[in-house]
Every structure is written in C-alpha cells, then in structure tokens.
Amino acid sequence: ASKVCEFSLRHHSKEDLDISLLKTPALKKKKLYWRPYKNQSTQFTYTRFLIPYLQKYKGWAMYCDNDFLFLNDVKELLSLQNNSKAVICVKHEYKPKEKIKMDNKKQTQFERKNWSSLMLINCEHPDVKDVDLSMVNEESGEYLHQFDWLNDEDIGSLPHSWNWLVNWYRTDKGDGHPDALHFTEGGPWIADSEYKQTWLNYKKLMEEENESKRTTTISR
C-alpha cells in the first residue's frame, strides 16, 4: 500500500516531492522510538508524531497514513498551509460501527478519530516544538491523536475531500468528490471496499511504469 500511495502522489505532482517512510526498526535503532508494539494498530500509530523532531522543528511537513490514494496534485493541499496554525487536518465526525478493523485489530473509539491520519504540520510552531521524544514515547494514544497537546484554535481545518474516508463519505449523499482516498476501514484489497478498482488501477499503472523503466535500463 505504501508504494501505491507514493506512486499516486508522484503521478499527479508537477513538482518533485521529498517523500520519506517512517520505518519503525530504523527509528528504534537510532533510539528515537521505544514504545512497545502492544495495542498499536500499525507500526506508525505513534511514529508520525516524531516528524517535527526529525525535521529539526523547521518548516512544514505533511503526514498521511499509507492506505491513502491521491487523485489530484498534492500541491493544492500544501497551498492550504497557515502559519498561525500548529496542525491542519480534516476534522471528521467519524464514529465507525465496526468493533474490529484490518488485521483483526480492535477498533478503538475516541474523539477526533482519524484527524491525525493526514496532517499538515507546522514544525516551527511553539506548541509543536514541545512534541519531543518523551511525549511521543510515553504519552497515551488519546493524548497524541486527539491533539490534547494543542489549543483548539491552533488546529486548522482542511476540506474532507483530502481525507476521504472510503465507505464513510459518499458522493451519492452529497459529500462532494475525493481528492485523496483513505481506506481506513481496511486495505483497498478488501472485497467490499468502495474504490477498490480505482486502487487496483493505480497499482497496475505503477507496475507497468516500473516494468517499462526496467526494460529501458536493460536495453541500454
């Protein structure tokens, strides 16, 4: 899923993108991350909050879960940065009915669920500079994901089209149209997942482009 997500970002972008994956083993080896994996739904459940530290608290950064698929140029999203805000995200009113999600993990219910699944992070904001290694490794999931470390006025809003929760937002219910799909209820390979074919089409296109590059390299 990570590869398809990255491909979709680059496919639509007119500019070069600096994309890095949060790899938990590497972060642990550098002694930046030491939380036990117990009760985490993914390996990046908490590592996303290391981004300001990794950026040396400079500039802006964007985070998204790896089960995203971008349908438009992310430059449009990045243009929504606002230096008066610490974090900018889609403020979902999302309360899933399912008790179990992907990989048989418990579907934890908490306020502001999925707000942190896509974030524009102002790494230079004073409150963001408080997000240090101790906070990321020791504070509760609710504290981090509900942005309890921020004042409400420091959290900016994004259109939900950029974090379109598949099977939650619906074009046929007047929710508009997606700019970025988020397969939050499970991977896009799940049988009843809306937009499954869209994801598979991007995967196929990625594989075709990769094969074309390999063929070109061999022919030289």
Residue ranges and their predicted role:
Residues 16-17, 61-64, 69-70, 127-131:
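Short secondary-structure capping/junction motifs at helix and strand boundaries
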Residues 28-34, 98-101, 166-171:
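Short, solvent-exposed polar/charged micro-motifs at secondary-structure junctions
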Residues 6-7, 48-49, 103-104, 165-167:
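Short alpha-helical segments and helix-capping/turn motifs at coil-helix boundaries
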Residues 33-39, 101-106, 173-176:
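Short, surface-exposed amphipathic charged segments that create phosphate/polyanion-binding patches used
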Residues 13-15, 21-24, 118-220:
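A glycosyltransferase accessory/donor-loop signature
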Residues 1-47, 54-57, 197-220:
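N-terminal anchoring/stem segment of glycosyltransferases
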Residues 80-144:
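Conserved catalytic core of nucleotide-sugar-dependent glycosyltransferases
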Residues 47-96, 120:
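GT-A fold catalytic core of metal-dependent nucleotide-sugar glycosyltransferases
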